A protein has these predicted regions:
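Pre-Walker A (Motif I) flank of P-loop NTPase domains
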Residues: 1-3
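Hydrophobic anchor at the beta1->P-loop junction of P-loop NTPases
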Residues: 5-7
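Conserved beta-strand segments of alpha/beta enzyme cores
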Residues: 25-27, 88, 114-116
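ATP-binding Walker
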Residues: 11
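Conserved substrate/cofactor phosphate-moiety recognition/catalytic segment
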Residues: 17-60
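Glycine-rich phosphate-binding loop used to anchor ATP phosphates in small-molecule kinases
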Residues: 44-100
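Walker A/P-loop
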Residues: 14
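Small-molecule kinase domains that catalyze NTP-dependent phosphoryl transfer to phosphate-bearing small molecules
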Residues: 78, 83, 92-136
Length: 136
């Protein structure tokens, strides 16, 4: 199962992923770490597409091994989300603008999500993880 945690920079994607990972016993790929490993800091539309495909390949490998995998990354456009092709989408809709103006301009609100987080709290991760595990 591929879980996408998406949202603007600073919305709490990594915070949520870090807390959900042990509950789900999932593999976890953070976009910043993956970009660092690839030495690819291109945030242009083309760079974003490349990153979505990179995250997809990692997640698809984990899924093919029967594991749950969490990927947290901005995933700013419908094209990047389509490329990644998540089984579950969690949108961190906790802020209206992030710290990078180019990302704010590029970011498209997703049309379909499974979970929409509108505020950060100490229980979101438990609630969402429990619901996911009910359906595994």
């Amino acid at each position: 199962m591929k879980i996408l945690i998406m949202g603007l920079p600073g919305s709490g994607k990594t915070y949520l992923a870090k807390r959900m990972q042990p509950i789900l016993k999932a593999a976890w790929y953070n976009a910043d770490i993956v970009r660092e490993m690839a030495n690819d800091w291109d945030f242009s539309p083309e760079g974003r597409i490349r990153q979505s495909l990179r995250m997809k390949n990692l997640a698809d490998f984990e899924k093919s091994q029967g594991r749950i995998v969490i990927c947290d990354f901005v995933c700013p456009t419908s094209e990047t989300k389509k490329n990644f092709n998540p089984d579950i989408t969690i949108w961190m809709n906790t802020i209206k603008s992030g710290r990078y103006e180019d990302t704010n301009k590029m970011f498209e609100e997703p049309s379909e999500v499974d979970y929409k987080v509108i505020e950060m709290n100490d229980t979101n991760h438990e609630t969402i993880a429990a619901k996911i595990l009910e359906n595994v």
